[in-house]
Amino acid sequence: MRIALDASGGDFGYQPNILGAARAVKELKCEVILVGDEKVLKEQLASLGLSDLKGLSVEHAPDVIDMDADPAKEVRSKKNASVVVAADLVKQGRAKAFVSAGNSGATMVAALMKMGRIEGVLRPAIGAPLPTVKGLMLLLDAGANAECKPQHLMQFAVMGSIYTQKVFGIRKPKVGLLSIGEEEGKGNDLVKETYPYLSNLGINFCGNVEGRDLPFGTTDVVVTDGFTGNVCLKLEEGLAKAMFHMIKGEIKKNPIAMLGAMLAKPAFASVKKITDPDTAGGAPLLGVDGVAIVSHGKSSETAVFNAVRTAKRLVDSGFVSDIKQHIAEYKEIFEKLEAKK
């Protein structure tokens, strides 16, 4: 299996992408196409002693889309941008999936332009795996759609359920609707309008969940609009780092606490690994006709490796076919709602 990697994407340049790809080739038994400036990539591969690594190849793409650039405009004008070429490799059938830690908006636009949407999907969504005390939970949308309607959230719920079944191995995932209270009548207009539709959708809908419920894994899937979802995602990432920083500061104040911390070091390391965004590696773009992974801009070698691993797992699982099937089953419901807008 070949996976295309936007080697120019991310805040730290080529090296973490190359090292993560090399590790994936060695450990996952897959092939990775590094997409970026051919001259720079070959120089970096040589300096890292990876020029002859079987399964690692280079595809020339001289242009880069900056993090602060207009996604739609840049994707249309820069045909040779690394993220565009990576998506095109999937369209051509030369790769089964693509991964990018670059401009997330550009990644979504490139995926839509080159791979297209699954028929019947109104809007693709970013599904972010988040750590909880019970394991991973999927939050969507995590930033693709700032403004949403009930029919969009309904589709997010369906796609999120399929993802957690296929990737997390949960037979009947619990789905929650993010709100400001557990009661059905709580929330803004979007939440209130969406609630009855989710209740009658045939999924395992468990009602409203509050922000405080997310870290405890009350449900396996949490559905919300992209603006709220992205705020939740960034808050959880920042909170985990802040907690470790505060604990470290308090431990240093007390010699006895320092001794206890030494004994608890393995436990701290384990929790840190679980809460580290690099462990998930990336978030799938659900609803496009193929596998596309959106990674964090600050992705390390480990994050890149895990993003490639997620891409491979999704291809192997056949989850895109399952989404097509389920969206088709709900097509009449979605079309009626869309006609009312």
From Swiss-Prot:
It is found in: Cytoplasm. The lineage of its organism: Bacteria, Pseudomonadati, Elusimicrobiota, Elusimicrobia, Elusimicrobiales. Coiled coil: none annotated. Pfam families: FA_synthesis. Belongs to the PlsX family. GO terms for biological process: fatty acid biosynthetic process; phospholipid biosynthetic process. Pathway: Lipid metabolism; phospholipid metabolism. GO terms for molecular function: phosphate:acyl-[acyl carrier protein] acyltransferase activity. The gene is plsX. Keywords: Cytoplasm, Lipid biosynthesis, Lipid metabolism, Phospholipid biosynthesis, Phospholipid metabolism, Transferase. It catalyses: a fatty acyl-[ACP] + phosphate = an acyl phosphate + holo-[ACP]. Its EC number is 2.3.1.274. This is Phosphate acyltransferase. It comes from the Bacteria. It is an enzyme of class 2 (transferase). Catalyzes the reversible formation of acyl-phosphate (acyl-PO(4)) from acyl-[acyl-carrier-protein] (acyl-ACP). This enzyme utilizes acyl-ACP as fatty acyl donor, but not acyl-CoA. Homodimer. Probably interacts with PlsY. GO terms for cellular component: cytoplasm. The keyword Glycoprotein does not apply.
